[in-house]
């Protein structure tokens, strides 16, 4: 909401090209998210004024009258919700972020890391057995990390926790790659 209000846009993609999943990865330093969705709504002030009661009703209507937004609000698989509200002279912006939080790191991940730095943690995954960490790079390229940031890796990455679950039949397994926090790897 703050990004939209002060950077003059309204939508799910910010001017720098980021979507809600990138914002979740930037701000929550422990979350491992299986699914996420975002709702945005806005009410503009008319001639510099707005009616608070009317604005709340209009924002609520904007969200509940949209089939996609309503589906996000009523989704039974959502485990956590975050909401941001910003009021300025020009209007009110509301952002709702919905996640299926499937796991968490045991400690917050640093914002900046360096090659060789250890990843001495085993995340708790709901329903999955942790296998290893990975790094999602630009262009959806993935690199296995093991227990440390490898030499040669640099720039912005998104940590992933890779898990495995036994299937219904012997020898059948499911795998998952859960997006985690964003990290800048420096040299």
Regions found by a protein language model. Name each.
Residues 1-8, 124:
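A short alpha-helix/helix-coil micro-patch that ends at or immediately precedes a cysteine
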Residues 14-100, 130-167:
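A well-ordered secondary-structure block
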């Amino acid at each position: 909401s703050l990004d939209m209000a002060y950077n003059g846009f309204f939508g799910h993609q910010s001017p720098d090209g980021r979507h809600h999943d990138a914002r979740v990865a930037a701000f929550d330093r422990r979350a491992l998210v299986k699914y996420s969705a975002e709702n945005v709504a806005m009410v503009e002030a008319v001639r510099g004024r707005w009616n608070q009661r009317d604005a709340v009703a209009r924002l609520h209507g904007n969200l509940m009258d949209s089939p996609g937004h309503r589906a996000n609000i009523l989704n039974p698989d959502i485990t956590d919700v975050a909401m941001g509200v910003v009021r300025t002279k020009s209007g009110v912006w509301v952002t709702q972020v919905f996640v299926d939080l499937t796991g968490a790191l045991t400690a917050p991940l640093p914002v900046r890391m360096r090659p060789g730095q250890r990843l001495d943690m085993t995340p708790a995954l709901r329903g999955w057995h942790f296998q290893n960490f990975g790094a999602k790079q630009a262009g959806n390229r993935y690199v296995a990390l093991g227990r440390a940031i490898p030499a040669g890796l640099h720039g912005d990455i998104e940590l992933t926790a890779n898990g495995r679950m036994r299937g219904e039949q012997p020898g059948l397994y499911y795998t998952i790659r859960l997006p985690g926090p964003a990290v800048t790897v420096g040299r």
